[in-house]
Structures are given as structure tokens and as C-alpha cells.
Amino acid sequence: MEYNFREIEKKWQKIWVDNHTYQVNEDASKQKFYVLNMFPYPSGAGLHVGHPLGYIASDIYARYKRLQGFNVLNPMGYDAYGLPAEQYAIQTGQHPAITTVNNINRYREQLDKIGFSFDWNREIRTCDPEYYHWTQWAFIKMFNSYYCNDEKQARPIEELIEAFSTNGTQGMNVACGEEMDFTADEWNAKSEKEQQEILMNYRIAYLGNTMVNWCPALGTVLANDEVVDGVSERGGYPVIQKVMRQWCLRVSAYAQRLLDGLETVEWTDSLKETQRNWIGRSEGAEMNFKVKDSDIEFTIFTTRADTVFGVTFMVLAPESELVAKLTTPEQKAEVDAYLDRTKKRTERERIADRSVSGVFSGSYAINPLTNEPIPVWISDYVLAGYGTGAIMAVPAHDSRDYAFAKHFNLEIRPLIEGCDVSEESFDAKEGIMMNSPRPGAPEGGLVLNGLTVKEAIAKTKEYIKATGLGRVKVNFRLRDAIFSRQRYWGEPFPVYYKDGMPYMIDESCLPLELPEVAKFLPTETGEPPLGHATKWAWDTVNKCVTDNENIDNITIFPLELNTMPGFAGSSAYYLRYMDPRNHEALVSPAVDQYWKNVDLYVGGTEHATGHLIYSRFWNKFLHDWGISVAEEPFQKLVNQGMIQGRSNFVYRIKDTNTFVSLNLKDQYEVTPIHVDVNIVSNDILDLEAFKAWRPEYETAEFILEDGKYICGWAVEKMSKSMFNVVNPDMIVEKYGADTLRMYEMFLGPVEQSKPWDTNGIDGVHRFIKKFWSLFYDRNGEYLVKDEPATKEELKALHKLIKKVTGDIEQFSYNTSVSAFMICVNELSSLKCNKKEVLEQLIVVLAPFAPHVCEELWDTLGSTTSVCDAQWPAFNEQYLVEDTVNYTISFNGKARFNMEFPANAASDAIQATVLADERSLKWTEGKTPKKVIVVPKKIVNIVI
């Protein structure tokens, strides 16, 4: 019987669906294992061969763990909200819900063809109201919570309200936007609106004025990673910096826990370090500086309190509220022009760009230790979101301050003995202090001269704390997350507005569903697209959505017009997979206790500072409320590399429609042109297909070599514009899903990026055919016999089992594929057809090539799926070599080799070697001085 992969794969994909083969339920008798891929955004282009790489890798592992007896959860769903669907809707008028469903259906069709062991019973879509019910529910929880620094967890906001009404802010140690000070009487005297405004300073989900990346053309706020070189990643539209009132999540409250949690997870060191740097913990001090001839005072944060004597200027972030207060009338025009320029640069660009720019505010601050006046400048190298948005500049000991001082000819005052700051700053935290204070300064106060830097830092902190000039503080670079977007296609906020303040709708009324709108663009008055909705008001009496015309601001109020960002739906989806049809809770306690968290998470490193931070924060918040038993959502993380496109080029002779083959192109002046890789095979162009590809090539002529047109090639990002996108459907149709699965793994280590190159796919396909031929001959006769295996056959098998078991644990799938090829070659040479061997071979190969293995497993007479078999253990006794090859050397030079039984004694080996006629030749009749036998390696005869 011939290997007919089309029939086999279609047959088993249907059987898996009909028999619910991959459906899983909680089973207390089995140890659980939760495998998860970062779920895809269903774009209109569908999958290309790069997308399934991580899915295949995790699917192999999921199948392997099931064969080991684990109860494996391996779900899949869709991150279905997003900007592309909305942009398409704007262009075509087609509702995003329709295009999203169409795209999902296309993805599902493609995924099914590849043969994944997903439990589709648990499928989720973030745009499904049944799903975003729980996203809205979590948001309400966050709104109604504050973070207690003493207990290191979220607590109900009612506890804070009660504390304020009893003690005011006295004794409070809670996460907040700004520190407030009021008594219980002052709190109780405030109106409801005033109290709500104060509580916004403490809520975990809150409204705040933040600097955002605003894209006027798209009409929305963009995340930093959605902006490239000052324009939107999607569409290339200009982006400016703008202060807007936005919903935010107080992620910063969890900064230390996010750091600590990294010690408990199995992630790569590089990814952990990326998150540590993003969170950016720094220990330092806050110091207060007064403004000269003013009542204004502002605070700076510094990790080098010891350098306060070296401050020669102050710098404010352009977004700082202090800019307007400190800019003098004489400087206003210059400052306004500078602010206008900086608003076009994103924060990320400002961090990366080392060019110097700035403007003098016209004001001076007073150094609290020396009473010297210090000029206050404005520059975009200072960020509003880090520290206080103001810095004391010490150019002698900070490289960016140094560059600024050099550019604007400001004083540079060194504080470390012997340091040379003529060419660059001295940033090292080492040396002996000087100029602290400078010679001739008034006596009294803080003196650091003669101390080491470490001693000086400690002494300065103690001094400012004792004198009230500041305080010791730990600071984090991590910002609160902006959580609102001015778009249509996203989760609606369960929020209505009363007297300008936000209130939550009752949890019992969830989900609040996305309304229909006439247009997906902002309104003419600049409101988000939900401003077009005519039925978008909340009736607090009847607890339902009602027409806008009914708004009376007594019992019926306007609903929030913003929607949630893309990361809202992906922040807790792993929990919903555990219990996707539960209408009463995100996940039931019993189910949560069973699955706990994700044992293996597979996805790209590009999510290191986005999704992977937000999910960890979200999970820790839910953990505080007793909803997620595990504090960390993803125990082990594997980052798959990218499959790059292998582009092909044709070479057109300038000013002609003639194309010259690769190795002849240097004889002409040519222009390289990308050509569709689907009309190229092994770098040889299909000439007729090329002519039919585009009208302008219909009359093309060719200069060939040996009758063929050979294309050039390059490894580039896989994209439609380079015509190097390879559709997996084409590979599945031509070679089968099992070949695709094994070939993607064969390309190289999972974690590394590698080029897609079909030049080697035939070899993998031939391997599967050769594997098939162990069971059937060319005439279709079944070969398998129930006879004892030979020692050589068992050795080949157990060598494979040991190798593949270790490889799977290490995700070294490429070497596993090589091992399969070697083993099948060995068994073919041995003409092995023993059921004892082939049965175990099927099980070991099944995670990689499930369709063909199911078919052959069935032919062995099994009544269950190969998925329910048992992973074989390798037996070391079969791996012991019967004979050992010894190198025979004379005076250290290798001359020939001899085989000996593995258990041969040294005396016997020595006698046999000396009696060999080749030894007699090399000894020339002389008696050896010494014979050294190194067991299982070498015999060295010293003459």
C-alpha cells in the first residue's frame, strides 16, 4: 500500500474530531500539564509558514507529555480585537465583526490541516461578549481596589474610604499618584465628587492625565511599540506627544513583586534581564529644591545624592507642569517653540537619541546645601514619567548631563579626586570625594570631602532625612499602563459618568456589549467612534442600556466612549481557557486549583515588555483577590525564533524586458527584481509561470545558462511586498502536514531565527515514505511480524528513544528529526519488520508526525489512538557496545586499529596486539619497553 498522505491526514483529522480525541477534563488521578501558545491575531492574510513554528513545537511537547501519562491542556483561541480589522472596516464599510469571523474561519481551516492537538472545545475569542464579560469584571475589581504597601496586596477601596473617614491619611502607606495629607474631618467635609476625585489617586484602575502617543490620522492613542520613527507602525501616520485624560492601571504598585517573581520562573536569562531593566528598580533619594524669588518648590529623584555639591543646572521634562510655572515672559516664545518640536518625538525615540537639545526657562532653583542659584533648563532627555520629571544635573558625573553642559557651555564641577572630565564624564561610583563643599564655602552643614563614594551616598541620605531636605526612596522606571483607546473595535468600559466622575455598572449587568455605530471614525467634534452610537446611555434604575436622548443626568447617564486596549483581552486568557463555559466566574476555585498556571508558554520575545508584563500584573492582582492560586501565570517560557523568507530575484537588463540568469548577470547592467517564490523551484524559475505572473512580463525574454534560468536569493523578513510569503496550505497539499511539521522542526533550533528554504523538504518527505516502507512493501504487502527483535534492531530503537526523549525536554527538535532519519535508515538496512520495534518507533515519532503514526498504529491492531499509548523508556543494556575499536600506537603515533570484545581484559588485549603481524613490522623485532592499555580507547607500545 502506497503512502497516501492526503487520504490519511483527512481521515485522521475527522476521527480526532468525531472521537473528541483532544478534549480534556480535570482528572484528579492524573498529574496536569498546561501547554499554551500566545494566541494569534486573525489577520486577513491568514497564516504563513512562519506562524505555525511555535505551535508545532508546543504541540510536540503536549503530545509527548500526554504519552508520558499527563493530563494535558492544550487550548487555542483568537486575540480578535485590534486596529487592523477596524482600519479595514473604515476603508470598506464592512463591520469588523464580520471580517474578524471570516478571518477566524480561515485560520481555523489552516490550523486544522496541520494536525494540532488543540482542545477546540475551549476556544475563546476576545471579541465574544461571553469572554469580555470577565475582562470588564476584572476592570471593575481594579477600580474598586487600592494597593496596600504594608500588606503588599490589593485591598477593597471600601477599607480605604473607612480609614479616611476615621483617621484621614495618617499612617497610610498605599500606592498613589501623589502623596496627599488630610484629616478625617477634612475628608468627611468634602462632597461626593471631591471624595471621588481623591480616590482616583489611589484606585488600581483610575482616570489620570498622562502623556500619550496621539495619532490624529488614526484618531487614537498608540502604545510605544506601535510607533516607529515618529509615525504609526500601521499606516505610517504622524504621531505627536499629547496630554490626555486616560484610563490607567496602577501597574507600578506591583513593580517589586514583578521583579521578585522573576526568580521563581523558568525563563531565559536574557528575557528576565529585559524585564528587570524595564521595571528599572533604583535606590536613591528625593530632594526638595526651592525656586529663587518664588514660593514654588519641586522635588527631584537621584541615585547619586552624594553629587549634590556638583549640581550646576536643573532640567525639567518638556511635559512637566513646572514648565509653565517657571518659564519667564522673556523666555516664553523660545520655550513654546521647543515644546512644539519635542511633542513630535516619542518617549522611546528620546531615550534612544543621544543628540542634545534644550531651552533655558529663565528661572533659577536654589541648591538646598549650598544656597547657590542654579539655572533651570528644559530638555527632552528628561522624561516626565520617571522619577519626578525633574533632575539635578551633575555634568561631571553623568554622561547625558555632560553632553548637555558641553553643548550649552555650562559649568562642569568634578567631585572625585583625580578624575579627568576634560573629554568625558566620570560616571563610576568609586573614588574619594572632593569639592563637597568647595574650598572657601561657609562652614557647617554636610561635609563629604575625604569619604569614599559609598560612604558619601550613605551620609548624604542620612543628612537630608534628618534635616527634612528630602527622604530616602526606591524608585521604579515601570510606568502605569495607559488603558484606553479612542477606537471602536475593542472592549467597552463598564463605566457611566455622573457629574463628570466615573461610576461602574453593576457586575450583575455584565457584559456591557459593544453598540452598533454608523461610522468607525471619530465624530466631527473629536469624540471616539462610540460617540456615533445613538443607544449608549446607562439607566441606573432599570440597569440597562438605553437611548442617548433619555439622558437626564439624574437616573440615566452617558456611558464611556473609549474602549480598552489590545492587551486587555490577552492579560488573563490563560485562566479562561481553564473554565471557558463558566457563566458564574472567570474560573471556578476547583478548576483553578487543578490547572494552577501554564507549565509551558510559547511565544515571541517581542512581548517581553508588553503582554508578559501586563499578564503578570493582572494575574498578581487576581491572586490578591484569591482568584488565581498561582502568583505567576507562566512557569516556563520558550521564545520561538522567526522563520525568515527566502526571497528570489530575477535580473532585468536595463531598459529592456530581457532577464539574464544569475551567473551571467555581471556581463550586463541589470536591476534585481523580487519574484514570487511560488514560481521558483530550487532557485530555477518557471518561465511560463513568470510570463503569466504579471502583464508586463508577458513578452519577457530570457538569457539562460544550460537551458535554465537560475534566480538569485536572499534571506529577508517574510512579507507580501517581497513575494516570499509561503502559505502552509501549499506545503500541506504538496507534501502533507506531517512533512511540514517535521520540516519546520528540522530547519534549526526552535529558539533561533532561520530562513525558510524548501530545498530540503523533499528529504523529510522521503524519510516519511521510508518509515512507511518498514510496514508496507512496494506491492502493498504488510510486512510487520510478531517475532522477537534482534540485538541490533533493539540497539537502534533504544538509541533513538534515549536521544529523542532528551531532545524533546531540551526543545532540540532539529536533532530529533536527524535521529529519526538515522534510526529508520538503520532499521531499513537490517530489514526490520518486528512489531516489538516498530510499535515503539511509532509512539516516539507520533508527536512529530501524528497522522502517519495514527494510521500505522491502527494497522498494528490497536483500538485506541496512539495519543493514549505509553512513552517507551530506553534500556541502557541495549546501548552497551559489544565490541570496542582500539587505536594501536607506537611511540605515540597511531598506526592501525583493532576490534576487541567490550569486556576483554587488558592482558588479553596486549597479547593479541603484540602477536599481530602489523605490530611485528613496527617493532622490527625489538622488545617493547612498555605497553600501555587505556581501556576502550588506545594501546600505546613504547619501543
Swiss-Prot record:
The keyword Ligase applies. A motif ('KMSKS' region) lies at residues 717-721. One of its GO terms (biological process) is leucyl-tRNA aminoacylation. A motif ('HIGH' region) lies at residues 40-51. Its EC number is 6.1.1.4. One of its GO terms (molecular function) is leucine-tRNA ligase activity. Keywords: Aminoacyl-tRNA synthetase, ATP-binding, Cytoplasm, Ligase, Nucleotide-binding, Protein biosynthesis. Gene3D superfamilies: HUPs, Isoleucyl-tRNA Synthetase, Domain 1. GO terms for cellular component: cytosol. ATP binds at K720. This is Leucine--tRNA ligase. The lineage of its organism: Bacteria, Pseudomonadati, Bacteroidota, Bacteroidia, Bacteroidales.
